[in-house]
Structure formats: C-alpha cells, structure tokens
Design a protein with these regions (language model features):
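Conserved short beta-strand edge segments in small beta-sheet-based binding/regulatory domains
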Residues: 52-54, 81-95
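Short amphipathic alpha-helix segments
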Residues: 25-49, 74
C-alpha cells in the first residue's frame, strides 16, 4: 500500500479523528438529583470534544463523548456522582484494526 509505505496512512487516520478517545461512563443518580441537560451543558462549555450524549433514567446518567483528554471528563463526572462502567477507546487504534 503506497500510503502506508510512506507513513501517510497514519496521518490520514489522525486527520479523520479530531478527537481521539471515545469516552463512555455511567453516573449513579439514585441518591442524587442529577439533570443530564446540566451535565451536558457543563461538558460542552468546559471541555473540547464532540458527539456528546448525556441521557438517563431514574437510576443513572450515561455519558458518551469524543475527546483528546478523557481523564478530564472522568474527573468532572466523578464530582457529580459515583461513576462506573467506564470505557475509554482509542478510535485511531480501532481504525487501524488494533484493540482500542
């Protein structure tokens, strides 16, 4: 593959992903009055990224966000409530056929 032999394939993949890490987690809301819209607004206003989903039911709020700094999202969400089922996947590695 000509692109791969020159290293341009990696450059192309990096350009496809403005935000490298797919960050997903759940926040336990059983003991707290959490508003997923307020959480989404805070994330949007304070962190760089895209593809935000903040949705929930009476027990939890699910967060999904693409960012280059997933630890900041985890740190913030941990101040809001107990976080669990944390998944951080490297989308560039996944696009290259590797484990994310």
């Amino acid at each position: 593959d000509r692109l791969r032999s020159r290293g341009l394939g990696d450059v192309y993949k990096r350009q496809q992903f403005a935000y490298r890490y797919d960050t997903q987690l759940l926040i336990d809301r059983r003991d707290r009055d959490l508003d997923e819209d307020e959480i989404a607004d805070y994330i949007t206003e304070n962190f760089e990224g895209n593809s935000l989903i903040a949705a929930g039911d009476e027990d939890l709020v699910k967060i999904h966000f693409h960012t280059n700094e997933p630890w900041k999202i985890l740190e913030y969400c941990n101040t809001v409530g107990e976080i669990y089922d944390i998944v951080v996947e490297d989308m560039i590695r996944q696009a290259a056929g590797q484990q994310g």
